[in-house]
């Protein structure tokens, strides 16, 4: 199902159709497939095959990120750091950048207080400790 959705998304062997891609990718995402959840997050973030919805993007990225999908973790950091969205949250951005080891965390620190940085680092450490067996 996921592969068929990606084929529709890319127009590989079928006519490109973002709505069909969304339909086919949603099925495994709903069943817990992390790659499909990540892909669905991208579709919501970009408004591809579905209306753009940052809340839904965060939901799907988070589900994938909790399973260790590193690209979803990175995208969460970027989404939370994006001033163009209504989801701006430097603490969450820093947390996810910490988890992925992304250098972007240093860029957003200029907008954060020392307490916020400390809180983000604590959240990242807690998350890593809770997921170290995954």
Tell what function each PLM region has.
Residues 1-10, 39-46, 75-82, 106-107:
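Hydrophobic face of amphipathic alpha-helices that form TPR/SEL1-like repeat modules
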Residues 101-134:
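Terminal, low-structured helical/coil segments at or just beyond the last alpha-helical repeat
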Residues 27-28, 63-64, 100:
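Canonical positions in the second alpha-helix
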Residues 8, 12-16, 30, 44-52, ...:
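Short coil/turn and helix-start
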């Amino acid at each position: 199902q996921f592969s068929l959705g990606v084929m529709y998304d890319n127009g590989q062997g079928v006519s490109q159709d973002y709505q069909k891609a969304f339909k086919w990718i949603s099925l495994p995402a709903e069943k817990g497939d992390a790659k499909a959840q990540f892909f669905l997050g991208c579709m919501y973030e970009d408004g591809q095959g579905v209306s753009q919805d940052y809340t839904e993007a965060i939901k799907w990225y988070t589900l994938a990120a909790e399973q260790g999908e590193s690209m979803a973790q990175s995208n969460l950091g970027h989404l939370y750091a994006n001033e163009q969205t209504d989801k701006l949250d430097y603490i969450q951005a820093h947390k996810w950048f910490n988890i992925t080891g992304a250098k972007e965390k240093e860029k957003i620190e200029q907008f954060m207080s020392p307490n916020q940085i400390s809180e983000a680092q604590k959240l990242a450490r807690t998350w890593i400790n809770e997921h170290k067996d995954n």
